[in-house]
Amino acid sequence: MNQEYLDFELPIAELEAKIEALRAASDDKVDLTDEIKRLQKKSNELTKKTFANLDAWQVSRMARHPNRPYTLDYIEYIFTEFEELAGDRAFADDKAIVGGLARLDGRPVMVIGHQKGRTVKDKVSRNFGMPAPEGYRKALRLMEMAERFKLPIITFIDTPGAYPGIGAEERGQAEAIARNLREMAQLTVPVICTVIGEGGSGGALAIGVGDKVNMLQYSTYSVISPEGCASILWKSAEKASTAAEVMGLTASRLKELNLIDNIVQEPLGGAHRNYAKIAENLKLRLKEDLAELDGLSKEELLNRRYERLMSYGYC
């Protein structure tokens, strides 16, 4: 996969281009190893400096990075024996939501998540990660299956929001989201939710009610996009950077507000720079969360989940 850089990463991109050019020019007659090492060190230092001071708008753009790992990527790296399950048994199979049975270090679990696309065709097929009601009903069907078989549920959140099209509204988008919120609050199995990219409004919440809610370092979670907020408050999407700052949508800010439990650190430069490393970090987090939740009874799980939901809005 070709590395793509955001505008604030352009100085890093220039250094990386020079490094690649030197590697291509290096041969048995011309040894450029020392110069390559010098530039690599400079690139790493610049990357550390750049990513140590990202503002909320830059984090928002990182959360949408086109090379960022999606749900199926994490499934490939973290789980084994994944068996995808399709359809809501009522209308259709929504490819913006994927899910199925898998094993986490041998332990059976149910995995569910939003899925965006890479190619143009795949993006259209996945509806850019925006589920319709049938997607949320599929997710609920899999959660109910997990409940019957006493399987922990692991969800990955990455969506701009639920699809707002006329057809989706006619098929009961609001009802599907509301039902998921209610049913997830009553599940008697452990539920671990992780925001891996964009956590957009009710479309994210519909698979986001859990005993543990984690966020990747450069993910976001908010009731509206910065552009949408800016369009409402300032009548201009150009104020998106200002909106992002006041919305408190970053993992660090949400952790301060006790709205999430943990922040999963990303590799230097973001999750898209090293799929294996971010998957390793996330897998460790999931295993630690499961180990903690395994020690709780059904009543304790439900009481803690209820207390968590009732605490929202209080600092």
Swiss-Prot record:
The protein's Enzyme Commission number: 2.1.3.15
Name of the protein in its database record: Acetyl-coenzyme A carboxylase carboxyl transferase subunit alpha
Keyword Cell wall biogenesis/degradation: no
GO biological process, alphabetically ordered: fatty acid biosynthetic process; malonyl-CoA biosynthetic process
Quaternary context: Acetyl-CoA carboxylase is a heterohexamer composed of biotin carboxyl carrier protein (AccB), biotin carboxylase (AccC) and two subunits each of ACCase subunit alpha (AccA) and ACCase subunit beta (AccD).
Residue stretches making up the CoA carboxyltransferase C-terminal domain: 38-292
UniProt pathway annotation: Lipid metabolism; malonyl-CoA biosynthesis; malonyl-CoA from acetyl-CoA: step 1/1
SUPFAM superfamilies, alphabetized: ClpP/crotonase (SSF52096)
Broad class of where this protein is predominantly found: cytoplasm
Location relative to the cell: Cytoplasm
Protein family: Belongs to the AccA family.
Function: Component of the acetyl coenzyme A carboxylase (ACC) complex. First, biotin carboxylase catalyzes the carboxylation of biotin on its carrier protein (BCCP) and then the CO(2) group is transferred by the carboxyltransferase to acetyl-CoA to form malonyl-CoA.
Superkingdom classification of source: Bacteria
PROSITE patterns to which the protein is assigned, alphabetical: COA_CT_CTER
Any one of the GO CC terms: acetyl-CoA carboxylase complex
Gene Ontology molecular function: acetyl-CoA carboxylase activity; ATP binding; carboxyl- or carbamoyltransferase activity
EC class (word): transferase
Catalytic activity annotation: N(6)-carboxybiotinyl-L-lysyl-[protein] + acetyl-CoA = N(6)-biotinyl-L-lysyl-[protein] + malonyl-CoA
Keyword tags: ATP-binding, Cytoplasm, Fatty acid biosynthesis, Fatty acid metabolism, Lipid biosynthesis, Lipid metabolism, Nucleotide-binding, Transferase
